[in-house]
Amino acid sequence: MRDEQALAALSWMERIAFRVMRFLNEGWGRRPARIWQLGVITPLVGWLLVYRRLRVYGIERLDGIPRDAPILLVTNHRTFFDLFILGWLLIRHPRLSRRVNFPVRSNFFYETPLGLLMSALLTGGSMFPPFFRSAEKKAMNRYSLDILLEKLRTPGEMVGFHPEGTRNKTGDPYTLLPAQPGAGELALKARPVVVPAFILGMTNHFWTEVKANQRRTPLVIAVFGKPVELPEVRGETRLSHHKKVADLLNEKIAALGAEERALRSAVSPPASPARAAR
């Protein structure tokens, strides 16, 4: 019943897209979608875009995470490829390889047939669930958040999330946008292992990145932090709690950004990391 109530505010195309993507995540389509994501498309994107120019730091900080622990991966957001590459790095970890879900704004991917096709084929259905900008679809956003909470309470699941809530297009990639409370709510209510990360060096243009990978420049640097210790909250959590934790996650990501900045200056000439905002 709640499913139908939440979907009622969506257009016919959005309802179809949601059901297709849910099938790839919760129906019998989940297994082939997982094989496609982990075995084909994510490694292919990583190999095409960054394999020859990627530097990874801090991955050893994750060695103590239990094999089946649910993981919330929180990162900065400069390009469409951020979570793709970070997810690719994690699935290569001997104990952390699992399907990753990347919640996405509904624009294009849930509103057009081409967007749905690209989402299904190019991500293996991992861009699920969707979030909507319009106020009349607020119930759907609550429903999507509850789907993520359920995933993050399930052993072996991983969700990638941007506390900033939207892509940071400013000229300074090291100054994050204000954190939105959604990431804090997921962390507090589900209590997963929260892994912060920072990545920089890419644009939003696929072929530009393919060519850059062949040239091995500019460098793409990814830094992982140790799991975040979450505060204990007695009773029901409130919006103020969610925002406070989201701010904490942003602080952890920003600290990794400072680490990335120092590493970048040590391994390469001064570059223009702000290029990723374009």
Question: Which residues does each PLM region occupy?
Answer:
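Non-catalytic C-terminal accessory region of glycerolipid acyltransferases
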Residues: 2-16, 20-24, 28, 138-278
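A transmembrane-helix-recognition feature enriched in membrane-embedded lipid enzymes
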Residues: 2-57, 85, 92, 113-125
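A generic local structural motif
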Residues: 41-42, 56-61, 89-90, 115, ...
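Helix-to-loop junction immediately C-terminal to a conserved catalytic motif
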Residues: 45-77
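Structured helix-beta-strand junction loops
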Residues: 50-51, 68, 124-125, 154-155, ...
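Residue-level signal for beta-strand positions within conserved beta-sheet cores that form or flank
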Residues: 52, 96-98, 218-220
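Short, flexible active-site-adjacent loop segments at beta-strand->alpha-helix junctions, enriched
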Residues: 60, 77, 106-108, 165-167, ...
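Catalytic core of membrane glycerolipid acyltransferases/transacylases, capturing the structured
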Residues: 65-137
